[in-house]
Amino acid sequence: MSDIPKEPVSRQVDVGGDQSEVITVLSDPSSYSPPVPNVERIETHGALVFLAGDYAYKLKREVKLPYLDFSTIAKRESVCRHEIERNQEVALDLYICARPIVRLPTGELAIGGTGEPIDWVVVMNRFDQADLFDNLAQQGRLPVELMAPLAEQIATYHERAQPYRALDGNEVLAKVVTQTIMSFFEAGDPLELSQVHEYAGRIVAELNTQSQLLRARSQHGYLRLCHGDLHLRNIVLRNGQPILFDAIEFDDNLAKIDVLYDFAFLLMDLWHRDLTTHANHCFNTYVSKAVPTEGLNGLAALPAFLAIRAAIRAMVTIDKVSIVDENRQCEARKDIADYFSLAHQVLQAEEPVLIAIGGFSGTGKTTLAAALC
């Protein structure tokens, strides 16, 4: 693996330029055609989403982070267009187009039309925020029965995804781990350096143990162009079915990953929320649909995949701390600690357990086995 710094270094994050004029226009109900009664705004570390009428308008923040660069108009246009391409296969009825924010000859800004583009937005069909799996989970309303169709959809997504056999699966993950650990060192607070050192040592050791397996999996076609950001905030219940959206659009290399590593993000998120029964149902369905017998040995890398995903979520939440209000900062800091704790937890080896279930026909052996596994 690449060398990992032993001490913190300055964090190179460009918080970007002034998009206030564009934000003002997108926040104004009269800017839309036809005008809307009101506009709601949702903020993430990389975008601002404006909910207006039946549509949502996603504005990329003018930022440059270690893992994404939206610092110019040209880059934001490119990434908006690519977001449409990346998501239309699985979320065709959500994504509409990339649209410019233009300066009219009068000097005013408009959403679309003829004029000089000064920014870009992704236009989507709006959905009820209550139907996000993230919100359903927080409110205790996420049915475990949705885990099977969700896992089947992910299995189909992975089956259709383009493989990249020439890539080295071990090198791909090693780069992710190195970047994540460097980001932790650069961030300093809210993580103790001793915690970062401990995680770094354990995950590097685990990757070294699984290096041959990871290389073999990429050679056998398990490394593909995946979703890349497969957690509960990027799944919505629409017409009674789970829909994946918001696949990584700013760097395809971050999405060219092992299919099990892609799937691990969802498992980690369910585990993080104490939805272990949901995780088990999702895992078992996915394995039965998408993992052939010869691919079962890949499950040996699952602890590393889960740990890396938890660490990445902690890293992204660290970046979010600086852009939220004080009340939400406390919540974000707790999330960071919880994610980092989970990253340590899943790397702890546990002894396997074999359970045999017996009984007469029709007494519920299969139901009990499904609940236990």
Residue ranges and their predicted role:
Residues 1, 101-107, 320-324:
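Short regulatory "switch" loops immediately downstream of catalytic or recognition motifs
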Residues 2-27:
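Cysteine-rich, disulfide-bonded extracellular modules and peptides in secreted proteins
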Residues 12, 253-256, 272, 297, ...:
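Hydrophobic alpha-helical scaffolding
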Residues 20-227, 232-312:
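Conserved ATP-binding subdomain of kinase catalytic cores across diverse folds
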Residues 84-87, 184, 318, 347, ...:
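Generic helix-packing signal
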Residues 286, 323-373:
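Glycine-rich phosphate-binding loop of ATP-dependent small-molecule kinases
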Residues 310-322:
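Extended, well-ordered alpha-helical segments in internal regulatory regions
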